[in-house]
Amino acid sequence: MKKYITFGSPSIGKEEIRAVTKCMKSGWIGTGPLVKKFENNFAKYSKSKHAVAVGSCTAALHLSLNSIALNKGDEVIVPAMTFCSTVNSIIHSGYVPVLADVNLNTMNIDPNEIEKKISKKTKALVIVHFAGRPCDMKKILKIVKKYKLILIEDCAHSIESSYGQKKCGTFGMYGCFSFYVTKNLVTAEGGMILSNEKEKVGPIKQRALHGMSKDAWKRFSDKGYRHYDIIDAGFKYNMTDIQAAIGLEQLKKIKKHLKKRD
């Protein structure tokens, strides 16, 4: 009998199964305390001040691009080689994606190609740390400063990656991560936004859940029901406690798993 290799088979152990079972038995499986704990732990791991857990990296990118509130038709430079969601998120935010070629050796966006694509309408840059290899941040940060661009990092491939002493996802205004089933840290589906800008995090968290001022955990916890308002026209991009339960256990193993791959 031939051995069948499953696509994207994640490394799930008894710890994850036990954590999910405990969550299900708790009676609270939606967005709640485990999501908050996962956000805090991931921010600490990444050495970022703030984190917002969401339903996917696509959701993270869309929320980040939506948050920067550019004018319709403004241009956002993006690498020519990336997954479709990087570009789709730009389009869904009302902006125009401008493709810049990648370096043939690193497969990351080429800083020289970025400068060639800059126009009067260019307002932001989305980079992708492809296959876990960090982009040339020294050159990219010079370009960002020179042209006053907003930088967003697509870190779907680079949970463990660092450039110098800084983790990928902490250089720009936002860092967007994926916990899809094929990634090094999985929650089945899921993502995370990192940011060091406190004033940006609250609105993003609200927009990720319909624009509501309080999520269900805050409305129905042991302190009793509390009124909520719809602050913004938001989306349905929140993470659940079941996903966070898996993520918390996966995060504990990430350094050990990295050593095995090395």
Label the predicted regions:
Residues 28-75, 89-93, 99-101, 166:
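Phosphate-binding glycine-rich loop
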